[in-house]
Amino acid sequence: MGDVVETEDFKITFVSAGEYKSDNEYITPKKGYEYWKFKFKFENTSDTDQNVSTMMDWECYADNSKADQQWIGDDSGLDATLSAGRQTEGTVYFEVPKDSKHIELEYDINYWQDNKIVFVGK
């Protein structure tokens, strides 16, 4: 946590990661799983508008197995079209096995190319 990565268009700060427990009784992980919350800050360092997506740009792996992304509905997503110099902060959530030893989150820098940043949550 606290890592900063600079891409062609963004300065990305990995703010935090950890288990997430909802106060809503209807938002619960399936048996043997828990929710993980990853918080990021994105700053547009380019000269043009750039999009950030909560649901489209991320993949999570727990012990090298793909984890399901979850929509918690707390209005803290990263979705934004950022003008040059603007920033946003938000979270993405995934459902991972409770006994996971390693949790990694991949951010797809460019949909058309195979460029990814890997953030280690655990």
Describe every region a protein language model picked out.
Residues 1-122:
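Conserved functional micro-motifs across diverse proteins
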